[in-house]
Structures are given as structure tokens and as C-alpha cells.
Amino acid sequence: MISFFPNKPMYHVQPHISFITPERTMKTIPAFSRWAFAAVAGVFVFAMQVPKVKTTILQPIAFIGDHFKDKTPEEDKWL
């Protein structure tokens, strides 16, 4: 009898954890990283007004730190 498939395909189970496979993970990493970047940027937009965030996180940044320093004269501060 002649075989229809002289080089038979080798079927095997793809490695997975539940429904998460390496192929599916590689497809979702770019989308996840974009959403994570947008979430972090959103947190910084809302947290920029908090004085503790300004002094401890934003002011030490090299090029944009001067933007967050308070340059208001003392006589103009009322709080």
C-alpha cells in the first residue's frame, strides 16, 4: 500500500498554561505595553498637582525638573 503522506506531519501539543500560549502572548505584548504606558502617563498627569509627587519624583528629572520648581515670590503665596 502506498502512503499518501510520505513525510507525515508531526502533530504535537503546543505548550500552554490554561489558554495562554507563547504565540498568543507575543501578539498581546505590544497592545498591553501601549495600554500600560497610557495608564502611567494618565497617573502622572493627575499626580502632577500633588506637592509630594512634584518634589520627590518630578523635580529630580534632568531636563524637565526645572519646570516643576516653585518660582512664585513669597509675597504672592497666600497658602
Swiss-Prot record:
Keyword Transmembrane helix: yes
Top-rank lineage group of the source organism: Eukaryota
Residues in the Mitochondrial matrix compartment per record: 1-23
Alphabetized Pfam families for the sequence: QCR10
GO CC aspect terms: mitochondrial inner membrane; mitochondrion; respiratory chain complex III
Keywords on record: Electron transport, Membrane, Mitochondrion, Mitochondrion inner membrane, Respiratory chain, Transmembrane, Transmembrane helix, Transport
A biological process term (GO) from this entry: proton transmembrane transport
Biological role: Component of the ubiquinol-cytochrome c oxidoreductase, a multisubunit transmembrane complex that is part of the mitochondrial electron transport chain which drives oxidative phosphorylation.
Protein name as it appears in the record: Cytochrome b-c1 complex subunit 10
